[in-house]
């Protein structure tokens, strides 16, 4: 039997149904702190709750394109995304078996604030540690496994902070060393020694 014959008789219905989705973690650096953009769910389950913007992947759609579509349609953002992990716990969604691919977007504050103003069903919440808090400082629980997805995105952001320039997308086109150090402190969750921070940047070749 060759491939053509096999595929002609192949029955996808012989396997349990499985859906693929994407969930995006849109981050920004605003008022000296990391923030994540969340959108209010319009449908059940978890209707009315704040969640990461996400969507199901269309049959003929690339994963990255689906992530950008979710950002554009639900958050009003047109920005590059970076894939960081798949999330496939059997019980992560009550509807059916859904595997979600996690993506991250880093956006400067000006762009993010404009998107928040135009997207009425979105809110910008501060990130503290691996959790989010509302304007009153109360911790906000996210539906599904979105809390785990956010935590993984933040872990990857911290890991790659000194490896590449991805996190620079959280800053405007021009910024001071003070702003850059404040960003690093917000991401790491700790105060950094100013001379040591600048020395490390110079030694890495990213600052002259």
What are the roles of these predicted feature ranges?
Residues 186-192:
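Short, basic interhelical loop/turn and adjoining N-cap
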Residues 16-18, 62-65, 98:
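Basic, often amphipathic N-terminal segments
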Residues 24, 83, 103-105:
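A structural signal for short, well-ordered beta-strand segments
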């Amino acid at each position: 039997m060759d491939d053509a014959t096999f595929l002609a008789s192949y029955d996808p219905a012989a396997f349990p149904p499985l859906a693929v989705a994407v969930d995006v973690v849109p981050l920004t650096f605003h008022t000296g702190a990391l923030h994540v953009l969340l959108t209010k769910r319009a449908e059940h389950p978890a209707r009315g709750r704040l969640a990461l913007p996400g969507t199901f992947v269309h049959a003929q759609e690339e994963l990255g394109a689906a992530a950008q579509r979710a950002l554009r349609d639900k958050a009003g953002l047109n920005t590059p995304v970076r894939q960081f992990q798949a999330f496939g716990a059997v019980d992560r969604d009550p509807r059916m078996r859904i595997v979600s691919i996690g993506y991250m977007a880093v956006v400067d504050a000006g762009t993010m604030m404009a998107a928040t103003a135009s997207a009425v069903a979105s809110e910008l919440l501060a990130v503290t540690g691996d959790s989010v808090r509302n304007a009153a400082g109360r911790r906000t629980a996210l539906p599904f496994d979105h809390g785990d997805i956010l935590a993984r995105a933040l872990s990857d952001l911290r890991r790659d902070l000194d490896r590449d320039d991805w996190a620079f997308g959280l800053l405007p086109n021009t910024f001071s060393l003070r702003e850059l150090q404040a960003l690093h402190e917000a991401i790491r969750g700790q105060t950094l020694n100013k001379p040591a921070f600048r020395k490390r940047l110079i030694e890495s070749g990213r600052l002259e």
